[in-house]
Curated annotation (Swiss-Prot):
Pfam families reported for this sequence: Ribosomal_S6
Gene name of the record: rpsF
Disulfide bonds: none
Annotated source species: Pelodictyon phaeoclathratiforme (strain DSM 5477 / BU-1)
Any one cellular-component term (Gene Ontology): cytoplasm
SUPFAM superfamilies, per database record: Ribosomal protein S6 (SSF54995)
Protein name: Small ribosomal subunit protein bS6
Family: Belongs to the bacterial ribosomal protein bS6 family.
InterPro entries: Ribosomal_bS6, Ribosomal_bS6_sf, Ribosomal_S6_plastid/chlpt, Transl_elong_EF1B/ribsomal_bS6
Length: 134
Protein backbone atom coordinates (compact mmCIF):
# COMPACT_ATOMS: atom_id res chain seq x y z
CA UNK A 1 0.00 0.00 0.00
CA UNK A 2 1.31 3.41 -0.96
CA UNK A 3 1.59 6.16 1.59
CA UNK A 4 0.14 9.56 0.90
CA UNK A 5 2.59 12.37 0.27
CA UNK A 6 2.15 16.12 0.30
CA UNK A 7 2.08 17.82 -3.11
CA UNK A 8 1.47 21.30 -4.42
CA UNK A 9 -0.01 22.16 -7.78
CA UNK A 10 0.43 25.60 -9.27
CA UNK A 11 -1.91 26.47 -12.12
CA UNK A 12 -2.08 29.23 -14.69
CA UNK A 13 -5.55 29.44 -16.20
CA UNK A 14 -6.34 31.61 -19.22
CA UNK A 15 -6.91 35.06 -17.71
CA UNK A 16 -9.12 36.17 -20.60
CA UNK A 17 -11.89 33.82 -19.53
CA UNK A 18 -14.99 34.91 -17.66
CA UNK A 19 -15.02 34.35 -13.89
CA UNK A 20 -17.47 31.46 -14.26
CA UNK A 21 -15.15 29.64 -16.68
CA UNK A 22 -12.19 30.15 -14.36
CA UNK A 23 -14.22 28.80 -11.44
CA UNK A 24 -15.21 25.80 -13.57
CA UNK A 25 -11.56 25.09 -14.43
CA UNK A 26 -10.59 25.32 -10.75
CA UNK A 27 -13.47 23.03 -9.80
CA UNK A 28 -12.38 20.53 -12.46
CA UNK A 29 -8.84 20.32 -11.09
CA UNK A 30 -10.07 20.00 -7.51
CA UNK A 31 -12.63 17.37 -8.50
CA UNK A 32 -10.03 15.32 -10.38
CA UNK A 33 -7.69 15.36 -7.37
CA UNK A 34 -10.40 14.23 -4.96
CA UNK A 35 -11.93 11.66 -7.33
CA UNK A 36 -8.55 10.01 -7.86
CA UNK A 37 -8.07 9.63 -4.11
CA UNK A 38 -6.34 12.86 -3.10
CA UNK A 39 -7.26 15.12 -0.23
CA UNK A 40 -7.02 18.90 -0.71
CA UNK A 41 -5.60 20.77 2.27
CA UNK A 42 -5.54 24.34 0.95
CA UNK A 43 -6.43 26.39 -2.11
CA UNK A 44 -4.92 29.81 -2.75
CA UNK A 45 -6.34 31.75 -5.68
CA UNK A 46 -3.88 34.53 -6.43
CA UNK A 47 -5.87 36.05 -9.27
CA UNK A 48 -5.14 37.57 -12.65
CA UNK A 49 -1.56 38.59 -13.34
CA UNK A 50 0.48 39.48 -16.38
CA UNK A 51 2.67 36.58 -17.43
CA UNK A 52 6.41 37.03 -17.83
CA UNK A 53 6.14 35.89 -21.44
CA UNK A 54 3.29 34.81 -23.73
CA UNK A 55 1.98 31.31 -23.06
CA UNK A 56 -0.11 29.92 -25.91
CA UNK A 57 -0.30 33.52 -27.20
CA UNK A 58 -1.87 34.71 -23.91
CA UNK A 59 -0.29 37.39 -21.72
CA UNK A 60 -2.75 37.39 -18.79
CA UNK A 61 -3.12 34.37 -16.56
CA UNK A 62 -5.19 33.51 -13.51
CA UNK A 63 -2.80 32.02 -10.96
CA UNK A 64 -3.86 29.46 -8.36
CA UNK A 65 -2.11 27.17 -5.94
CA UNK A 66 -3.48 23.90 -4.49
CA UNK A 67 -1.86 21.83 -1.74
CA UNK A 68 -3.02 18.25 -1.42
CA UNK A 69 -2.04 14.82 -0.19
CA UNK A 70 -2.21 11.82 -2.48
CA UNK A 71 -0.55 8.55 -3.32
CA UNK A 72 2.22 8.66 -5.90
CA UNK A 73 0.16 6.76 -8.46
CA UNK A 74 -2.57 9.42 -8.30
CA UNK A 75 -0.29 12.14 -9.71
CA UNK A 76 0.02 10.48 -13.13
CA UNK A 77 -3.75 10.05 -13.29
CA UNK A 78 -4.36 13.68 -12.35
CA UNK A 79 -1.83 14.92 -14.92
CA UNK A 80 -3.43 12.72 -17.58
CA UNK A 81 -6.74 14.52 -17.11
CA UNK A 82 -5.59 18.13 -16.69
CA UNK A 83 -2.94 17.97 -19.43
CA UNK A 84 -5.61 18.24 -22.13
CA UNK A 85 -7.73 20.93 -20.50
CA UNK A 86 -7.63 23.85 -22.95
CA UNK A 87 -8.29 26.55 -20.35
CA UNK A 88 -5.13 25.62 -18.40
CA UNK A 89 -2.11 27.39 -19.83
CA UNK A 90 0.41 25.75 -17.48
CA UNK A 91 0.50 23.52 -14.43
CA UNK A 92 3.22 22.16 -12.21
CA UNK A 93 2.86 19.48 -9.55
CA UNK A 94 5.74 18.99 -7.14
CA UNK A 95 6.29 16.79 -4.11
CA UNK A 96 6.83 18.83 -0.95
CA UNK A 97 9.79 17.24 0.78
CA UNK A 98 10.74 17.98 4.37
CA UNK A 99 13.57 20.23 3.13
CA UNK A 100 11.12 22.34 1.10
CA UNK A 101 8.73 22.59 4.04
CA UNK A 102 11.57 23.68 6.32
CA UNK A 103 12.66 26.33 3.82
CA UNK A 104 9.06 27.57 3.56
CA UNK A 105 8.89 27.97 7.35
CA UNK A 106 12.10 30.01 7.36
CA UNK A 107 10.86 32.26 4.54
CA UNK A 108 7.51 32.82 6.26
CA UNK A 109 9.27 33.68 9.50
CA UNK A 110 11.17 36.58 7.93
CA UNK A 111 8.71 37.88 5.37
CA UNK A 112 5.52 39.89 5.45
CA UNK A 113 2.78 38.80 3.08
CA UNK A 114 1.59 41.58 0.79
CA UNK A 115 -1.89 42.60 1.83
CA UNK A 116 -1.49 41.27 5.36
CA UNK A 117 -2.62 43.37 8.35
CA UNK A 118 1.02 44.15 9.18
CA UNK A 119 1.62 45.38 5.64
CA UNK A 120 -1.45 47.65 5.63
CA UNK A 121 -0.50 49.02 9.07
CA UNK A 122 2.95 49.95 7.72
CA UNK A 123 1.37 51.64 4.70
CA UNK A 124 -1.01 53.63 6.91
CA UNK A 125 1.85 54.73 9.16
CA UNK A 126 3.87 55.85 6.13
CA UNK A 127 0.88 57.78 4.75
CA UNK A 128 0.30 59.45 8.12
CA UNK A 129 3.94 60.53 8.35
CA UNK A 130 3.75 61.96 4.80
CA UNK A 131 0.73 64.11 5.69
CA UNK A 132 2.41 65.36 8.87
CA UNK A 133 5.56 66.26 6.93
CA UNK A 134 3.54 68.37 4.47
Amino acid sequence: METNKLYECTLIIDGGLQDEAIAAAMALVQRVITEKGGSISSVLEIGRRKTAYPIKKKTIGYYAHIEFTAATSVIAEVEKVIRYEEDLLRYLIIHLTSALLEMRKRVEKYSVVIGSPEDSALAEAAAASDTVAK
